[in-house]
């Protein structure tokens, strides 16, 4: 390449000062336009395809996110419904447990009252039996003591009729 014309042109420009070169061929505007035109013409298909693929990926991503959002909303609604059902069921279980507890409490109290009455009756019966036994022992002791004193005091003085009267009276006292 010959640099000489460029050097001469630069020297001439320096001698004239600063100026605007309006020669289109010298300024390479046409060359740049041709390069850009070819670049656009050749790269348009490639960039169109790349941008189309990118647009398609973005649209698919948006659809997928929207689907996930709808699915999450459905799962949330299902979870809320399940929670509501669980709360209702828990309330029913608590109410049932309270009812059962009250019923069992009433049964236990009733059974306790029955048991207390039965124990009292048994204690009263045992007390009456013990009183009767003690009373019988006391009567026997009194009769035995009375007979012993009579035997000491009246040896040979009692006839058979008097002994019979004493025995009958002693038997009446026992009843």
Curated annotation (Swiss-Prot):
The chain crosses the membrane at residues 22-42. It is found in: Cell inner membrane. It is a single-pass membrane protein. GO terms for molecular function: proton-transporting ATP synthase activity, rotational mechanism. SUPFAM superfamilies: F1F0 ATP synthase subunit B, membrane domain. GO terms for cellular component: plasma membrane; proton-transporting ATP synthase complex. Belongs to the ATPase B chain family. PANTHER family: ATP SYNTHASE SUBUNIT B, CHLOROPLASTIC. F-type ATPases have 2 components, F(1) - the catalytic core - and F(0) - the membrane proton channel. F(1) has five subunits: alpha(3), beta(3), gamma(1), delta(1), epsilon(1). F(0) has four main subunits: a(1), b(1), b'(1) and c(10-14). The alpha and beta chains form an alternating ring which encloses part of the gamma chain. F(1) is attached to F(0) by a central stalk formed by the gamma and epsilon chains, while a peripheral stalk is formed by the delta, b and b' chains. NCBIfam families: PRK07352.1 (NF005606). This is ATP synthase subunit b. It comes from Gloeobacter violaceus (strain ATCC 29082 / PCC 7421).
């Amino acid at each position: 390449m010959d640099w000489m014309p460029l050097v001469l042109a630069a020297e001439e420009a320096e001698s004239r000062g600063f100026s605007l070169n309006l020669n289109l061929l010298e300024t390479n505007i046409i060359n740049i336009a041709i390069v850009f035109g070819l670049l656009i013409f050749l790269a348009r298909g490639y960039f169109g395809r790349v941008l189309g693929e990118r647009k398609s990926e973005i649209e698919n991503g948006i659809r997928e996110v929207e689907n996930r959002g709808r699915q999450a909303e459905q799962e949330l609604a299902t979870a809320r419904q399940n929670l509501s059902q669980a709360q209702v069921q828990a309330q029913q279980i608590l109410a049932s447990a309270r009812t059962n507890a009250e019923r069992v409490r009433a049964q236990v109290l009733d059974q306790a009252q029955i048991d207390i009455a039965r124990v009292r009756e048994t204690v009263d019966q045992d007390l009456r039996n013990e009183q009767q036994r003690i009373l019988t022992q006391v009567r026997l002791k009194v009769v035995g003591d009375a007979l012993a004193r009579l035997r000491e005091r009246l040896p040979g003085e009692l006839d058979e009729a008097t002994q019979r009267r004493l025995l009958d009276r002693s038997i009446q006292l026992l009843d």
